[in-house]
Every structure is written in C-alpha cells, then in structure tokens.
Curated annotation (Swiss-Prot):
Protein's name according to its UniProt entry: Glucose-6-phosphate isomerase
Sequence positions bearing N6-acetyllysine: K80, K228, K234
Assigned keywords, A-Z: Acetylation, Cytoplasm, Gluconeogenesis, Glycolysis, Isomerase
Single biological process term from Gene Ontology: gluconeogenesis
Species whose genome carries this gene: Escherichia coli (strain K12)
UniProt pathway: Carbohydrate biosynthesis; gluconeogenesis; Carbohydrate degradation; glycolysis; D-glyceraldehyde 3-phosphate and glycerone phosphate from D-glucose: step 2/4
Family annotation (PROSITE patterns): P_GLUCOSE_ISOMERASE_1, P_GLUCOSE_ISOMERASE_2, P_GLUCOSE_ISOMERASE_3
Molecular-function GO term, any one: monosaccharide binding
Length: 549
C-alpha cells in the first residue's frame, strides 16, 4: 500500500479549483438544470438497497475529479493489498482480514503463505455446534435446567457490534434473552445480574487476551455472583464460555477450553462481529441467520473489490465524505436510521469511523495539514427531528447526513410505517430545497397576517436548504441486507483512510488514558493526599477521597 499525501496530488489541486466554482452552487440549481439527476446519482445493490446521492453538492465533474484522487492515491492497489492478506496495519505488523471471516466463496486467503479459511470455517462450525446445543436446550446448567439468558461481557468491538446487530435483528431472535455488559462502572453488571437467574444464565467473556481491565473486572464479578448460588467452582464451566486466544487464563478462570472460541490478530476489534465475537449474535438469531449476515457482507465485499470507482457504492460515499470534510470544512456526519431496531447503528459506526480514522499522523509518520476522520453521531428518526434537526436545518454548521430506512417494516401497525417514511422522504427534501422567504411571506399573506407580524416573523421561518444528504433505502432489514449495509460503511471508512494516507486499523489513541488509569488506581486505595500530578488532577483525586469517606 503506497503512502501518498493527497494534498500533493494533481487531483487535489484540481478539486480545490473546482470547489471555488462549486461553493455557491445550490442543490436546487443542480436539480433544476437536470431533470434526470436522480437516475445519474443513484445506484442499487443486489435489489436489496438503493443509494441515492443526488441531494449532494456535486456534479458529474465533481465525482470525476474525486475518482481521479482515488486513482492517484492508488485506492485500487490498497484494496488488493487488504483482500490478499498483506500486512497493511503496519504499526502492529498485521494483516486486516475481516473480509476472510465472511468469505462465503471459500477461495483461499493467505497470511504469511498460509490459507486462513480452514481455521475460519472450523471456528464457525464450532460456533454452530455450541449454539445449537444452547438454543435447543440440550445444554444444561448446573441444576439441570436449560439456558434462558445470555450475558455478553466485553467492551468496544467486543460489545458494540454484537449489541447493535442483535438489536437490529430482533425480529429474528429466538427465545433466549440477550444482555450486554461493557462499562467497568459496577452499576452496569449489577443491574443486569438483577434480571437473571444463575441456574439458567450463560456468560460469554469476550476478550482476546483475557486481560482487558473492564471485561475481566465484570467477568470476575459475574463469577463471584454465580458462585454465591452454585457453590462449587466446577459449575463455572457450565455457565461461562470465552471468546479469546489465551487458553491458559481461560482455563484458570474455570472455563473449559473446549468452550473457548478463538480469533486471530488479523481481526480488528471494531471489525470483529463477523468472528467468534459474534457468538452472542448466533445465540440470538441462530446460526443460519448469522450465515446470512456473513453472506450479505460478502456480497458487498465482492462489489467493493470488483466494481469500478464510478459505480462502487462504498467508494462513492467515501469520496463525497472527503469532499465535504476537506473542501467545505464540514467536521461531522450524522447517521440517521428511520428504524427503531437500528437504534445502535450510529453508535456502532461512531466507533467504527472515529477509532479508525481519528488520526493526526500520516502513514509516513508526519503530522497532517488536512482533515482526517469526521465526528460521527446520530439517533433514530423521528426522535432526532424533535431533538437536533433544528441545527441541521437552520444552524451555522454543515452536517452531511445519511438517512437510512427499510421499505418494508417488521411491525406493520396501522399506518405507522407510512408516517415514518413520509418523514424520511420529507426531511431530505426539506434539507436540500429549503423554504424561501417568498414562500413564507405568501403563506402569511394567505393566513391574513398583518404586515408588521409578517416582517418580524418571516426571517425565522426561512430554510436556506442546500444541506447535503444521502438516502439509503433498504427493501427490508434482514440479516443479509444488514450485513451488506455494515460492510458498505466499513469499506467507506477504509477508502477514506487510504486516500487520507492514515493507518485505519490501529488505535493508539486509546492507550495513554489506560496507562495513566493503571498508575492512578493504586493511589485511590488509601486516604493519603495526592500531590504527584498536575494541580487539577491532584485536586480532583483529593476531593474524591474526601467525599467518599
């Protein structure tokens, strides 16, 4: 994978000139000049997904210049490098092969000359056998009762992905109750333990090293709680399984290593739901539906790795994002799913994007002088409309938005879904075209308002429009379509990282806080006054000690 400063390319310079021509062009003008704009700036995927990017401040020339940037930065070569098992995570000397986890074609993928697919398939088969025993009730707890509740204990990628997917696919869930514990705050584990019965609960401890502070603290608390009821430590093996590679630590915890599900160093945490980390997903929706999730992602992988840039959905969305982030100065993107089951989707890709591309040093080790990853946030519609859409419509910041919705709902109650989708369609129209002063004035005249009221109120009712959006319409949210949607965003993030010349698959930014916390923890165990830090940190620690008593 080549290291190319994007700002030094001819394409970047051409884009800068093009931006000067485009910065005052409105989306309304673009639609007025081209009645065929929707068909030119939209595409379908597998008859499952329609991506409409026509309501953006772009032209065919814009996309051509952005695609030139991708070519100059050798995006095609980078894609080949990732899919072929090259160690593109250079700071950790690792391959990046979440695509192998969902490689349903089973074509060999090599790391250090070894095909990884036999091991991938072996773990999948092990997950299938284990999950079927739990779901069927064949697996019994220490008192002979079947499992009714599953508690996934993990953090970051070991929590966000499985939680998001199990929520998004709740219509496919079986009888097992799923719970997720991540925060080291004891409240999180305590509240979950109030809901479950030690006789019928299975805990999944998700930690590759089996040393993650938050996860192991919660796991030991769960073990202590369990043993208060079960008594004999031999019963731990019937109620705990591990998603890990540290067999020694897993065995010492009391877990049968036959129930340890491994994954590999080429699986990044925030791309790990496709691996053994997804065992909670399998237990929730069944193995066949999990395979459908993998198949949807694999279909998007094929699209991404074989489709030319001008028709490649992850590439197009990535390039449009760079256009706003680096030329218009937009610092944020909102992900707005109009589906309540998808309520954790934005949070999942908040980690997926910000931990991947939140870097200020390029692949050569130099501080960048351009924007890298955007701030990602969002909530489900229509809730967001009554919370933060005000700023998106009439604020001073540009917030490019992705609107996501299914055409078919899993809960066809009355006309709920039509009302939901009417809002979905209305919001992107309102953001793009706004409402002019002339229209507002005419509305007030039609209502018989007096001129003084009209003059005062009208400015507050004007919508400038020209706010960019993408609309992603799914036929229905199924395991397959969700898998494809997740992979679409994963590859968008990768594409942006390649072009921005940063390492997308490490996360050194999470380390310093952990190191300092480990240094501070012993200082909190007594009542001595602390003076070893800066005055602010000393003051906070000392007040904490005084208040805790």
């Amino acid at each position: 994978m080549k290291n190319i400063n994007p700002t030094q390319t001819a394409a970047w310079q051409a884009l800068q000139k093009h931006f000067d021509e485009m910065k005052d062009v409105t989306i309304a003008d673009l639609f007025a000049k081209d009645g065929d704009r929707f068909s030119k700036f939209s595409a379908t995927f597998d008859d499952q997904m329609l991506v409409d990017y026509s309501k953006n401040r772009i032209t065919e020339e814009t996309l051509a210049k952005l695609q030139d940037l991708a070519k100059e930065c050798d995006l095609a070569g980078a894609i080949k490098s990732m899919f072929s098992g090259e160690k593109i995570n250079r700071t950790e000397n690792r391959a990046v092969l979440h695509v192998a986890l969902r490689n349903r074609s089973n074509t060999p993928i090599l790391v250090d000359g070894k095909d990884v697919m036999p091991e991938v398939n072996a773990v999948l088969e092990k997950m299938k056998t284990f999950s079927e025993a739990i779901i069927s009730g064949e697996w019994k707890g220490y008192t002979g009762k079947a499992i009714t509740d599953v508690v996934n204990i993990g953090i970051g990628g070991s929590d966000l992905g499985p939680y998001m997917v199990t929520e998004a696919l709740r219509p496919y869930k079986n009888h097992l109750n799923m719970h997720f514990v991540s925060n080291v705050d004891g409240t999180h584990i305590a509240e979950v333990l109030k809901k479950v019965n030690p006789e019928t609960t299975l805990f999944l401890v998700a930690s590759k090293t089996f040393t993650t502070q938050e996860t192991m603290t919660n796991a030991h608390s769960a073990r202590d709680w369990f043993l208060k009821a079960a008594g004999d430590e031999k019963h731990v093996a019937k109620h705990f399984a591990a998603l890990s590679t540290n067999a020694k630590a897993v065995g010492e915890f009391g877990i049968d290593t036959a129930n340890m599900f491994e994954f590999w160093d080429w699986v990044g945490g925030r791309y790990s739901l496709w691996s053994a980390i997804g065992l909670s997903i399998v237990l929730s929706i069944g193995f066949d539906n999990f395979v459908e999730l993998l198949s949807g992602a694999h279909a998007m992988d094929k699209h991404f790795s074989t489709t030319p840039a001008e028709k490649n959905l992850p590439v197009l969305l990535a390039l449009i994002g760079i256009w706003y982030n680096n030329f218009f100065g937009a610092e944020t993107e909102a992900i707005l799913p109009y589906d309540q089951y998808m309520h954790r989707f934005a949070a999942y890709f908040q980690q997926g994007n910000m931990e991947s591309n939140g870097k200020y040093v390029d692949r050569n080790g130099n501080v960048v002088d351009y924007q890298t990853g955007p701030i990602i946030w969002g909530e489900p519609g229509t809730n967001g409309q009554h919370a933060f859409y005000q700023l998106i419509h009439q604020g001073t910041k540009m917030v490019p938005c992705d609107f996501i919705a299914p055409a078919i709902t899993h809960n066809p109650l009355s006309d709920h879904h039509q009302k939901l989708l009417s809002n979905f369609f209305a919001q992107t129209e309102a953001l793009a075209f706004g409402k002019s002063r002339e229209v507002v004035e005419q509305e007030y005249r039609d209502q018989g308002k007096d001129p003084a009221t009209l003059d005062y109120v009208v400015p507050f009712k004007v919508f400038e429009g020209n706010r960019p959006t993408n609309s992603i319409l799914l036929r229905e949210i199924t395991p397959f379509s969700l898998g494809a949607l997740i992979a679409l965003y994963e590859h968008k993030i990768f594409t942006q990282g390649v072009i921005l010349n940063i390492f997308t698959f490490d996360q050194w930014g999470v380390e310093l806080g952990k190191q300092l916390a480990n240094r501070i923890l012993p200082e909190l165990k007594d009542d001595k006054e602390i003076s070893s830090h800066d005055s602010s940190t000393n003051g906070l620690i000392n007040r904490y000690k005084a208040w805790r008593g």
